[in-house]
Amino acid sequence: DPQETLPGLRWMLSTGEALSPELARRWLTRYPQVGLMNAYGPAECSDDVSFFRVDTQSTGGTYLPIGQATDNNHLQVLDDDLLPVPLGGIGELYVSGTGVGRGYLADPGRTALA
């Protein structure tokens, strides 16, 4: 069925929720001609801040990478003292750049807590 092959679709962008490796594998098996991109962007940002092009090899683990930062954004994993952790270390992801919101509109209390 030509409609099931999605002949006009060149890319599928997954964003908003984590894309599971299993779902990515199913997509790549069914639509190998359509590129698959895993995007990441927290609510505090105006849009996605990183992209990862998913291939069959990357779907073998328990999660998919979020990829590299988009232009004008920067990603770092920091510890409780806001210092960078070594590769593979445990910390929290910090996003900086032009896409990060400056606070909560007309709500200085929530902005201070953020």
Regions found by a protein language model. Name each.
Residues Y40-D47:
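SF2 helicase/translocase ATPase core recognition
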